[in-house]
Regions:
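Terminal, low-structured helical/coil segments at or just beyond the last alpha-helical repeat
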Residues: 28-45, 219, 223-269
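Structural marker of alpha-solenoid helical repeat scaffolds
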Residues: 46, 80, 114, 148-150, ...
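Alpha-helical segment of the N-proximal tetratricopeptide repeat
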Residues: 47-80, 97
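Residue-level recognition of tetratricopeptide repeat
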Residues: 50, 84, 118, 152-154, ...
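Canonical tetratricopeptide repeat
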Residues: 56, 89-90, 97, 124, ...
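Structural signature of tandem alpha-helical TPR/SEL1-like repeats
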Residues: 65-73, 98-110, 132-144, 156, ...
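TPR alpha-solenoid repeat register
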Residues: 87, 121, 155-157, 191, ...
Length: 269
């Protein structure tokens, strides 16, 4: 399955620190009238900073893949301080990661109702539409995000837009978006794989090889690119050149699915 990049910034967003000052202290409490008052139900005291604490806890849990636990924290934060767009965006991300797309859309929509220019939420909503196969709506959101020249994660959005076009078999538009995603610095690894895929579909195997070699230079730690190079070289009939790449996959990640595939290709499975 082609992975979706739902803006890495969305999952690592720094929640703004809140500093509260109080003019009253334990040593000098505020004076109060001494006349007797009628008894009334005490009003629960809610610490507004507790909402931020829950959001931070939820973010950590979400980054650890504990989405149900993260949702509990975000929901508690929303109960204490409702109407926070960042909180709705985080809840939407949890649901997106769980494949619960309707719930994800609901929260991204709420985030955008609260803050219409919330670019992270719009990109995440686009990723949700893409996962649901609603390609036109996904394209609309991604194009809108790219219209924000201040957004620091445009490469990931270009990758998402490229996936949208690729699913429509619009190879030219997809290639253009993926090429924008690999512009240095910090190119998107998966964009290289998709570009190599397009080149192969067009019968341009030599160009696919160049793209994969560039990916391997930029991402030497990624086992998958060695596997893709080995597979491509086998397709080109260059068995002797393919073998070292496939052997490298097995050496780097012997217990992985990539290694199983490499062994099968080498005839050692």
């Amino acid at each position: 399955m082609k992975r979706l990049i739902a803006a890495a910034a969305c999952t690592t967003m720094i929640l703004a620190s809140v500093f509260a000052c109080s003019s009253a202290s334990a040593e000098h409490p505020p004076s109060a009238p001494k006349k007797k008052k009628a008894k009334s139900q005490p009003t629960p005291v809610v610490d507004p900073l507790q909402s931020l604490t829950y959001m931070r806890q939820g973010l950590v849990l979400m980054q650890q893949g504990q989405y149900d636990e993260a949702l509990q924290r975000f929901q508690e934060a929303d109960r204490i301080a409702p109407g926070n767009a960042t909180n709705h965006n985080m809840m939407g991300l949890c649901y997106l990661r769980q494949g619960q797309f309707d719930q994800a859309l609901e929260h991204f929509n709420q985030a955008l109702e609260l803050v219409p220019l919330f670019t992270d939420a719009r990109n995440n909503r686009g990723a949700t539409y893409l996962a649901m196969g609603q390609l036109h709506l996904a394209e609309v959101d991604f194009v809108a995000v790219l219209g924000d020249s201040t957004y620091p994660h445009a490469k990931q959005v270009n990758y998402n837009l490229g996936l949208t076009y690729l699913k429509r078999s619009q190879l030219g538009a997809a290639e253009e978006s993926f090429r924008r995603a690999i512009v240095p610095p910090n190119p998107v690894f998966d964009a290289y794989l998709r570009l190599a895929e397009i080149a192969q579909r067009q019968g341009q195997l030599a160009r696919a090889k160049v793209l994969l070699e560039e990916a391997r230079i930029n991402f030497p730690e990624m086992t998958q690119v060695s596997l893709e190079l080995g597979k491509l070289l086998l397709l080109m009939g260059r068995t002797d050149e393919a073998a070292p790449y496939l052997q490298q996959v097995i050496a780097d990640a012997p217990d992985s699915e990539y290694a199983d595939t490499a062994r099968n290709l080498l005839g050692a499975g």
